[in-house]
From Swiss-Prot:
Catalytic activity reported: 5-nitroanthranilate + H2O + H(+) = 5-nitrosalicylate + NH4(+)
Positions of the catalytic residues: D88, E158
EC number: 3.5.99.8
EC main group: hydrolase
Temperature dependence comment: Optimum temperature is degrees Celsius.
Protein name: 5-nitroanthranilic acid aminohydrolase
Function: Catalyzes the deamination of 5-nitroanthranilate (5NAA) to 5-nitrosalicylate (5NSA), the first step in biodegradation of 5-nitroanthranilate.
Chain's gene name: naaA
Lineage: Bacteria, Pseudomonadati, Pseudomonadota, Alphaproteobacteria, Hyphomicrobiales
GO MF term set: hydrolase activity; metal ion binding
Domain of life: Bacteria
Required cofactor names: Co(2+); Mn(2+); Zn(2+); Fe(2+)
Activity versus pH, per record: Optimum pH is 7.2.
InterPro entries in UniProt: Peptidase_M20, Peptidase_M20_dimer, Peptidase_M20A
Similarity comment text for this entry: Belongs to the peptidase M20A family.
Amino acid sequence: MAGSNDVAKVMKTLDGMREGLIQTAVELGSIEAPTGREGAAGDYVYEWMARNGFGPERVGVFDDRFNVVGRLRGTGGGASLSFNSHLDTIMAREDTARFADANDRIYHEAWHEEGRIYGYSVVNCKGPMACWLIAAKALKEAGAALKGDVVLTAVCGEIDCEPVDEFQGHDYLAEDIGARYAISHGAISDYALVAEATNFKPAWVEAGKVFLKVTVFAGPSRYTPYVPRPVAALDSPNAIVRMAKLVEALEEWADNYEKRYTREYGGGTVVPKVAIGAIRGGVPYKIYRFPELCSIYMDIRLNPDTNPLVVQREVEAVVSKLGLKAEVKPFLFRRGYEAQGIEPLQNALEVAHREVVGRPTERPGSPECSMWRDTNPYNELGIPSLTYGCGGGAGGGNTYFLVDDMLKAAKVYAMTAMDLCNRTP
């Protein structure tokens, strides 16, 4: 652990950086960066790190979609710690197929008002990023003694965008070019703290996922005046009508699936949820002939112990029970992980949390352990990782952070680094 004088000096330095924290979070959160278009946000972080002496590098597959990696160098002999958050956000202004209010400013802007910083992009995930950027700046400016390096990692492509059908290439890649790419190309450390919203509750297990495309076949297609009636929905020549019955059956299966596959782990509880995220059938400007095929796209979360093929076969069994002609095809699989050897980071974080927040940490909620977070690529590659940050998640509807909580998070991050990076690896 760093000396008490170092800790006090860093905490005092952070108290003086409150306005800088607000400015960084608002500026970064105001940059439009939907998945596929993170370049401007990456440039901001690169320039910020360069200006503050962290020697950043652009590490990425594409010139306009890259990860930013900076370092606060230690003197040697101590454990290294990565901080990680993502640059991309959930919403583009043209995303009207998913959101009725896609142009609402809450998705595209950030602002400070009465001790709160508003904006989806702040909550997910540029607010936590601002916290560890400011924490690193305070460590540097206060001259804190660190033996191990602090690795600052701002990544692209964390949000669940995946190539499928004609949607291929640059704009549709996500996790393959984000944290995992950065780690594989040099952003390595002994431990990693993924800064995201967890209500100050650390979690070190995350779900995996399998995405399935399920296509129902019917036919023959007929001109509207020749539509046969009456006919049972499962016998309809219209694939959309048949799909309606399958969706109903899959929703019933999904409820049962999450109950059967819920698992308790040391790092949290995984409750694997299922969502039907998209449907394609017919041509909107040629509706006079109903479609002979209709597809849905399923997002199925997996606990770390579940084989995706088992889940695929369960979905196929639902289809078979209805007597439908259909194809069930996986187009994405990513495994979930529970951290191994996390105790040194967990213990350092616990000490820092108690000092700053004033109480022991609590067990995380299941949503924080049942989604994708970039703890997974770290844990996959053997770098023990947990996620921890202030406030509730944007996926659950939260739209702001308290500045006081963000400052607390920055202090916890700084104290954790001062402890862990002065331990022997």
